[in-house]
């Protein structure tokens, strides 16, 4: 066998294996090995090609890769095409930053076509960089054939889906109030709005009544919306009061909700008030008021129905109980305005600037106008109070600009018309965790508004809508509700007025913009908008298999078997797929969904540049390695729970994998020496003992637990079960138990049994861990076996019932508890494990514990290093010592109580019959005056375990001392062999000089044992001459307070025994 490094160095392993995979086409070999297996249709949630891999995307891709590897190893032909979201604002904003653009006007001046080409270049270049990022953490996907949302085949998938939606009558065009980014100058979806705490103006304003004394009082944090005010809303069931508010010699009548009067008047700093009259909200309906900025906004909403009071459901008994309503902005205001059949007054354009309809504010950006509007309200005498308000407010998900609400013409998928169908379809998918589906996701879907699918941008999939703009015969230029939705490139070629080659047409703007369609006497032009970028990824389940262009894969695979993303996708990709899948096909496009959390810092805070707490995957890999990072990320709860990244945790994972490396290394020199090939391990050969049978049974339990965990996507359970088996069962228990069998010189059935067992355990554990730590397991597999191109082409281990033995596992669990308790008792008694003890007594609480100890007494004696194991139901060597009960003795003996207690302290049970005598006075002692503590004698140490108590006899005999000192000397000699880097089979000569004559005699009694354990060929007496030999090593040691000088040299460089 090739040499294996003493230490696990992830970088060395990973570099070597990366080269090996490339040289052997290991990925292709793995796919080929499972080409005829049942299909598993995995769909990759496409990340935007707008940045580098961060810790969250590293976790996401590692999780996907692990699941794909597991599915392959369990007999599946996995669709593993990676995806990239390459359109939309995420790309546009990055390109604008590169070009130094600040507005759409900059893009128009630069040229739309040139800008789109820059977006395409940026997306493609970043995609290539992200390919490298993901491959750098060992992700095996079809990197030569990713699905890209900018490809004509994929764009066609979106067109086809939208056509299906239109055929169902679910496409609608109309003016609605939408979230709008004034910098990007486009509508954005409600689920794209991100929220932060901001400080806004807080003003209370009087709206003077037209036909009555007094004013309605409203409160708002958006003074800029007051020019668009159309009506005031009240709650029909609330009680409102007309109060005469007094301030000095002045007074005025204000109309406020009863519950808000005190707070509002405090804001206005009024001295006192009286209630003039009370009204219900219903009674206020129809009251008219004067626009507070009528002089500044001459063309304010002055049409029929404007400037009146109406009831509305969105009014609450908060602030003033009256709501200033501007249907041109607020979404609830717009909806109520539509119900009231009011015109929609919108004095703001797509740049977020006031139009000429806003009078003196024309050309001002809306938020920049806040101060001017507040001043004007004050000068008009209608500003009751002005301050600031801290609250959460939305901003654009890509450029961070605060959004505005603007009523604009948009295109919608009316998902509200199929809400019941959507909610029913949710039940057709299984979610991990299930609560994410039944609570978070269902609630989001239930409240989802109609989907605004149009964006007033450039880099995206163009809306495939051609709208009728005139009548070919009459030249009528009025628009209508007549439009055509094109579903494929072939259809476009057939229906367009211009020549279109479907195989070559670029479906992006501006190529499709000039195309027209003339049918039935009408001329149709394409709507200039592009799709909401969430439409792109919503069709991934068929776009990734090139449907509708290719139908075979769709017929065989669709819907997706499995998708996985973070919990923010409940309102993102999980929703968009459900929405489009249901609207276009009537089905949910996925069968299983896994939702993981976010990767945060060690304190659970979001990682960000401003906090300076970002941990990059590259940084983690440089410190610990790819496999340790993968295993660390996957060892935490994967279902809906955020990860708090800790460097210590990553370091511990590297240490854990190093333990596995040491387990892997341990038998190699012995096997090499004996010519044993682990690839040919056969459990039917050799002789098994109880620990072999136990570790093989534990292996079956681990396989069962691990497989069950994978099937429920409890990846952390799988990872931790495997690693705990490696560290606790194999390394700390089994390896220690078989060390002497491996060390033995002669061939034996027992040694062959140990070889076969450990080879089997290693082979199957390597395969169990392969999806988690692909580099390390590949290195181990190729060293131990290598019969296949790659470990990842092998089958995942299955449970072998022949080796299952639950009784043995239970008994061994008891043994290990007893062993741990014995170690604790030794520590209390100051006796190291290397030193034997005369006996260990197990006081068992029940028969099952006693039976287990007796069944495994031989092994247990060896593990706890004792000459004898005794099992008892009650340990009868405890010494009882009396403890006085002061609460009883004090009242009974008064002034003599303390002397009585001193006499009782530490006494025996005879006190109860004989009493105590003090200065010739006899005192009778009763049961209630004493409690008894049972303590072991000085030479016994004790420790409890779940099934009883372990007592360790730490008394010393000459033979025990001799063996103890010998074991200490053996450990030092073995350490020196390591320092000399000697092979396992290298024989040595040894010199041992003990400063204490008595201890020297004890060690001499064990000389044969020392020789056998250390492969000492001969002992020599003259240690002083050893320093003359350059290959010899001489060291001085402190062994239990005695100075022991040891010289060690390989036979080729013998120590001199001549004087």
From Swiss-Prot:
EC number(s) recorded for this UniProt protein: 6.1.1.5
Gene3D superfamilies linked to this entry: HUPs, Isoleucyl-tRNA Synthetase, Domain 1
Name of the molecule in the record: Isoleucine--tRNA ligase
Binding, ATP: 609
A GO molecular function held by the record: tRNA binding
PROSITE patterns found in the cross-reference section: AA_TRNA_LIGASE_I (PS00178)
Species name: Haloquadratum walsbyi (strain DSM 16790 / HBSQ001)
Stretches that traverse the bilayer: none
Record's subunit section: Monomer.
Cellular-component GO terms for this entry: cytoplasm
InterPro entries listed in its UniProt record: aa-tRNA-synth_I_CS, aa-tRNA-synth_Ia, Anticodon_Ile_ABEc, Ile-tRNA-ligase, Ile-tRNA-ligase_type2, M/V/L/I-tRNA-synth_anticd-bd, Rossmann-like_a/b/a_fold, tRNAsynth_Ia_anticodon-bd
Any single GO BP term: isoleucyl-tRNA aminoacylation
Domains as described in the record: IleRS has two distinct active sites: one for aminoacylation and one for editing. The misactivated valine is translocated from the active site to the editing site, which sterically excludes the correctly activated isoleucine. The single editing site contains two valyl binding pockets, one specific for each substrate (Val-AMP or Val-tRNA(Ile)).
Motif ('HIGH' region): 47-57
Cofactor(s) essential for the protein: Zn(2+)
Keywords: Aminoacyl-tRNA synthetase, ATP-binding, Cytoplasm, Ligase, Metal-binding, Nucleotide-binding, Protein biosynthesis, Zinc
Family: Belongs to the class-I aminoacyl-tRNA synthetase family. IleS type 2 subfamily.
Subcellular location: Cytoplasm
Motif ('KMSKS' region): 606-610
């Amino acid at each position: 066998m090739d040499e294996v490094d003493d230490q696990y160095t992830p970088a060395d392993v990973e570099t070597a294996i990366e080269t090996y995979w490339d040289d052997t086409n290991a990925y292709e070999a793995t796919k080929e090995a499972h080409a005829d297996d049942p299909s598993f249709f995995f769909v990759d949630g496409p990340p935007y090609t707008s940045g580098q891999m961060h810790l969250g995307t590293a976790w996401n891709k590692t999780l996907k890769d692990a699941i794909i590897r597991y599915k392959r190893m369990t007999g599946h032909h996995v669709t593993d095409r990676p995806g990239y979201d390459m359109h939309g604002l995420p790309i546009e904003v990055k390109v604008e930053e590169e070009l130094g653009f600040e507005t759409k006007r900059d893009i128009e001046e630069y040229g739309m076509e040139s800008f789109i080409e820059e977006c395409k270049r940026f997306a493609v270049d970043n995609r290539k960089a992200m390919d490298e990022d993901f491959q750098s953490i060992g992700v095996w996907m079809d990197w030569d054939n990713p699905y890209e949302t900018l490809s004509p085949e994929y764009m066609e998938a979106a067109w086809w889906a939208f056509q299906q939606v239109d055929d169902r009558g679910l496409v609608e065009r109309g003016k609605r109030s939408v979230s709008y980014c004034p910098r990007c100058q486009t509508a954005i979806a409600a689920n794209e709005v991100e929220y932060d705490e901001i400080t806004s103006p807080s003003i209370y304003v009087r709206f003077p009544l037209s036909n009555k004394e007094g004013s309605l009082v409203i409160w708002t944090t958006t003074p800029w919306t007051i020019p668009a005010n159309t009506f005031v809303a009240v709650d029909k069931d609330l009680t409102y009061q007309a109060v005469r508010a007094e301030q000095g010699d002045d007074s005025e009548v204000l109309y406020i909700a009863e519950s808000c009067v005190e707070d509002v008047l405090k804001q206005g700093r009024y001295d006192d008030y009286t209630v003039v009259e009370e009204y219900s909200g219903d009674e206020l309906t129809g009251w008219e008021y004067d626009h507070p900025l009528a002089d500044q906004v001459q063309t304010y909403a002055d049409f029929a129905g404007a400037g009146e009071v109406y009831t509305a459901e969105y009014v609450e008994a908060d602030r003033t109980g009256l709501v200033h309503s501007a249907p041109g902005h607020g979404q609830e205001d717009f909806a109520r305005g539509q119900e009231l059949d009011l015109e929609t007054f919108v004095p703001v354009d797509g740049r977020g600037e006031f139009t000429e309809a806003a009078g003196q504010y024309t050309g001002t950006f809306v938020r920049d106008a806040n101060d001017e509007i507040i001043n004007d309200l004050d000068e008009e005498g209608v500003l009751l109070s002005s301050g600031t308000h801290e609250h959460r407010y939305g901003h654009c998900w890509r450029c961070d600009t605060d959004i505005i609400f603007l009523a604009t013409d948009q295109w919608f998928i009316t998902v509200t018309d199929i809400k019941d169908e959507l909610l029913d379809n949710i039940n057709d998918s299984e979610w991990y965790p299930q609560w994410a589906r039944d609570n978070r996701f269902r609630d989001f879907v239930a409240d989802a508004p109609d989907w605004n699918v149009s964006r007033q941008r450039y880099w995206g999939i163009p809306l495939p809508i051609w709208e009728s703009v005139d009548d070919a015969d009459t030249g009528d230029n009025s628009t209508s509700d007549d439009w055509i939705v094109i579903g494929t490139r072939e259809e476009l070629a057939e229906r367009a007025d211009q020549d279109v080659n479907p195989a070559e047409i670029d479906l992006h703007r501006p190529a499709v913009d000039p195309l027209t369609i003339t049918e039935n006497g009408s001329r149709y032009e394409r709507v200039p908008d592009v799709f909401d970028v969430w439409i792109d990824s919503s069709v991934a389940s068929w776009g990734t298999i090139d449907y509708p262009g290719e139908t075979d894969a769709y017929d065989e695979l669709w819907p997706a078997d499995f998708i996985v993303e973070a919990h923010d996708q409940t309102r993102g990709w999980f929703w968009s797929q459900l929405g489009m899948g249901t609207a276009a096909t009537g089905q949910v496009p996925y069968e299983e969904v896994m939702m993981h959390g976010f990767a945060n810092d060690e304190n659970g805070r979001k990682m960000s540049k401003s906090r300076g707490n970002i941990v990059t995957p590259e940084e983690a890999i440089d410190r610990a390695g790819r496999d340790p990072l993968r295993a660390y990320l996957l060892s935490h709860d994967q279902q809906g729970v955020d990860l708090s990244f800790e460097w210590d945790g990553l370091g511990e994972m590297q240490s854990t994998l190093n333990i596995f490396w040491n387990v892997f290394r341990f038998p190699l020199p012995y096997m090499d020496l004996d010519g044993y090939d682990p690839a040919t391990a056969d459990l039917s050969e050799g002789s098994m003992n109880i620990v072999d049978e136990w570790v093989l049974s534990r292996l079956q339990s681990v396989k069962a637990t691990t497989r069950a965990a994978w099937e429920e996507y409890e990846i952390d359970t799988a990872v931790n079960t495997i690693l705990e088996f490696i560290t606790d069962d194999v390394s700390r228990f089994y390896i220690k138990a078989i060390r002497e069998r491996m060390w033995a010189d002669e061939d034996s059935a027992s040694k062959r049994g140990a070889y076969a067992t450990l080879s089997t355990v290693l082979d199957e554990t390597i395969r169990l861990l392969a999806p988690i730590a692909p580099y390390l397991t590949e290195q181990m597999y190729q060293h131990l076996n290598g019969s296949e191109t790659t470990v990842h082409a092998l089958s995942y281990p299955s449970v072998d019932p022949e080796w299952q033995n639950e009784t043995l596992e239970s008994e061994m669990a008891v043994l290990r508890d007893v062993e741990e308790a014995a170690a604790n008792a030794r520590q209390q008694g100051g006796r190291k494990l290397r030193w034997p003890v005369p006996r260990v007594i197990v006081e068992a609480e029940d028969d099952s514990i006693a039976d287990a100890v007796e069944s495994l007494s031989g092994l247990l004696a060896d593990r706890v290093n004792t000459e004898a194991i005794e099992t008892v139901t009650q340990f009868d060597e405890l010494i009882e010592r009396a403890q006085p009960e002061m609460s009883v003795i004090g009242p009974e003996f008064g002034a003599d109580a303390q002397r009585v207690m001193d006499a009782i302290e530490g006494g025996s049970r005879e006190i109860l019959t004989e009493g105590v005598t003090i200065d010739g006075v006899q005192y009778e002692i009763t049961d209630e005056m004493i409690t008894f503590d049972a303590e072991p004698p000085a030479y016994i140490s004790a420790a409890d375990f779940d099934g009883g108590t372990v007592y360790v006899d730490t008394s010393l005999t000459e033979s025990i001392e001799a063996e103890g000192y010998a074991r200490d000397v053996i450990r030092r000699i073995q350490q020196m062999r390591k320092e000399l880097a000697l092979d396992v089979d290298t024989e040595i000569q040894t010199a041992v000089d003990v400063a204490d004559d008595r201890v020297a005699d004890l060690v001499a009694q064990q000389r044969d044992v020392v020789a056998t354990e250390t492969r000492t060929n001969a002992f020599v007496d003259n240690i002083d001459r050893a320093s003359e030999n350059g290959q010899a090593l001489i060291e001085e040691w402190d062994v239990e307070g005695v100075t022991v000088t040891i010289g060690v040299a390989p036979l080729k460089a013998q120590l001199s025994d001549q004087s």
